[in-house]
Amino acid sequence: MKPIKLVYDKYENDLGFYHEDIDSTIEDRETLKGEILKLLPETVSGNAINKDRHFKIFTWGIKKGPGTDCDLIFDATTFQTKIDSELDVHSLNGFSEEIQDSIILHPKFLEIIERIVNTIEEKKPRTVGFYCNHGKHRSVGWAEIMKKYYYKNTTVKHLCSPRKNTRQ
């Protein structure tokens, strides 16, 4: 399976605007996150998203070793986010609210999550993979966001994460 890139080059991470329906003057991160989450896609091609879908999500880091064979694979290696400079990124992982919020606050988040959900709904995979460089922040964060906001019945297995390796 050829991986689907979440972003194609590092410049896509630097776009300075959000969805047209979001007030560009909002500076509070929580308010901005709330506005973004209100715009999460609920349909694909006019059909409701099957949030009861059962499948497995795997995450891994390509620098930590091989991943696993999946029906769909999403590449987050060039996806970058910004977090508060006072936070120690080494003490965080994709389970951390700060990491998940940084993904949600990415300027292309709505476009990317819509593409992921559309692909899952179209292909109906049994297994989905997310990988990044180390399998700790981005891939884990994306998998946890997919479980939290869309596919609550998935089983998530983090192949490189030291904490909560498998979640039902």
Model-derived features: positions:
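Structural alpha-beta junctions
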Residues: 1, 19, 149-156
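C-terminal accessory "lid"/substrate-recognition subdomains
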Residues: 3-10, 14-18, 22-126
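Short loop/turn motifs enriched for small/polar and acidic residues
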Residues: 60, 131-133, 159
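A structural signal for short, well-ordered beta-strand segments and their strand-loop junctions
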Residues: 75, 129, 155-158
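Catalytic cysteine-centered active loop of the rhodanese-like fold, especially the PTP/DSP P-loop
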Residues: 117-149
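Cysteine-dependent PTP/DSP-like catalytic domain, specifically the C-terminal lobe
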Residues: 144, 152-168
